[in-house]
Amino acid sequence: MNEDDKKLLSKDSDGLLTYEYIANHISSIDDELDYLIDNMMRVDLSGQFIVSAARYLFAIDAEHYNNAVSRLITAAIEKDREHRYIGDLLPLWGADYQDHVEELSKTDNNFRRIYKRLYPTGI
């Protein structure tokens, strides 16, 4: 990432530019990923692009991007107050996550927090 890229990303108003940068430079972002996530967390007030970035990185390589995905999920929970986007994260715990709600809620704090927000009486 060069200084021109950083200048461009500093003008990101909602997270879309940062998300696009991640998607378009996926093969070379490892060293800048923390910076990119910090930038996205700063500008994405709704959590929309944070959720998209978490899903994208998970789909590319869940193990390699585990820490980044975890940070993004935590940020999405905080940002998405209207719960418009965080529900899209639940399938990250498997297509059958609904069959394992109790177990996942006990073992994964992010899953528990998302599920509790979406289904406040479900746990």
Where are these regions (language model features)?
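Context-gated lysine
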Residues: 6-7, 11, 79, 106, ...
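HEAT-repeat alpha-solenoid elements in large eukaryotic scaffold proteins
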Residues: 8-18, 41-51, 73-78
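Short linear sequence motifs
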Residues: 12-14, 86, 104, 108
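Amphipathic alpha-helical scaffolding segments comprising HEAT/armadillo-like alpha-solenoid repeats
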Residues: 1-6, 28-40, 62-74, 95-105
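Acidic, proline/glycine-rich low-complexity IDRs
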Residues: 98-123
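Structural detector for internal amphipathic alpha-helices that build alpha-solenoid repeat scaffolds
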Residues: 15-27, 50-62, 81-93, 114-123
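Residues at alpha-helix boundaries and short interhelical turns
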Residues: 27, 44, 76-80, 94, ...
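N-terminal low-complexity, intrinsically disordered segments
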Residues: 11-41
